[in-house]
Amino acid sequence: MNSYHGFRDTTSLFIKGYHATGVMRLHQDHGSTADFPSREDVNNEADFLQYHFTNLCATATGACSKPCEDPGRANSTRPPFPQNQDFYRPVHPNRPQVPSFQSCREQGLSRKGFSPSSDTFRTFSSAHCELGPVNNTQTEVRTYDGPVRHSAVEDDNTGHGALNTLNETLHSGKTFEWMRVRRNQSRAAKIQLGKCSDRELKTNHGRDSDEDTSSGGSRTNFTTKQLTELEKEFHFNKYLTRARRIEIANPLQLSETQVKIWFQNRRMKQKKMLREGLAQGLMLISGCDEDSKKSDTCSSPD
């Protein structure tokens, strides 16, 4: 094999992508040696070398400028995974796929509850990145410059507004319905209207009298029958239990509180009478002593 044919085979191997060391080993394995070409061979092969060298450079440049991509997905625009369909968008076949920042921002804002009003588009060149240029492509990055308000903040502001309104209403001195105290009608008004029976009059009058007595009003007027029964019970029992008070109050058409208050007043009256009786007895004793002394001093001697 002459030098021309050997150089042609070597050039074809270089074009196919073999390394120079691999080409030399391939020639050694086949037992072929590369002879030094003569001057005539060099003159004849100058044009051939220039032609193949130009083709080799063009092929290498095209291979370097072509992006590395999967042969099975060379012309495919579908996302690598079904769950990332919103993250990718179809681009030019010669450009690498770039994540869609618009879909990412919309998903993030929708999850957090933001409601953007206006968007500003800014285009940044990848040549200014620290990682270096990437095929001089441009990536669109959508940023949000509008006012950001969360729904929870709005709810919180609404709650504070309602609380402030309630405080203003309370401090203004307005009287609500639940603040008004409803009292029973007086006995005279019920008699004039004639809307209740005698029993209801006595019961309600007893309750009203309790309220009036506790607040310093008029006292209850008991009937003769009620006073007789109460005096009879007081003669045997000065202190009553709650069950006994209820038992006495029902037939007398009185309340338990009325019976309790009557017994308290009756005990105080008895103590007062005892104190007055003791004082009168002491006064009588002291008067007798004085009379006896006067009689002794005024008596004439015999």
From Swiss-Prot:
User: Which ranges of the sequence are annotated as binding DNA?
Assistant: 215-274
| Residue ranges of the TM segments | none
- Cite the InterPro entries for this sequence: HD (IPR001356), HD_metazoa (IPR020479), Homeobox_CS (IPR017970), Homeodomain-like_sf (IPR009057), HXA1/B1/D1 (IPR046327)
Report the subcellular localization. Nucleus
Keyword Nucleus (UniProt): yes
- Which Pfam family would be a valid example here? Homeodomain
Alphabetical keyword list: Developmental protein, DNA-binding, Homeobox, Nucleus, Transcription, Transcription regulation
Q: Which GO terms describe its cellular component?
A: nucleus
Is Nucleus there in the keyword field?
A: yes
Point to the regions of Polar residues compositional bias.
214-224
Q: Which CDD domains match?
A: homeodomain
What are the start and end residues of every segment in region (Disordered)? 198-224
Grouped into one coarse class, the protein's main location is nucleus
Q: Name one GO molecular function term.
A: DNA-binding transcription factor activity, RNA polymerase II-specific
Q: Which GO terms describe its biological process?
A: regulation of transcription by RNA polymerase II
Matching entries from SMART domains are given as: HOX
Q: Specify residue ranges for compositional bias: Basic and acidic residues.
A: 198-208
Physiological role: Sequence-specific transcription factor which is part of a developmental regulatory system that provides cells with specific positional identities on the anterior-posterior axis.
Q: What is this protein called?
A: Homeobox protein Hox-C1a
Origin species, per record, is: Danio rerio (Zebrafish)
Underlying gene: hoxc1a
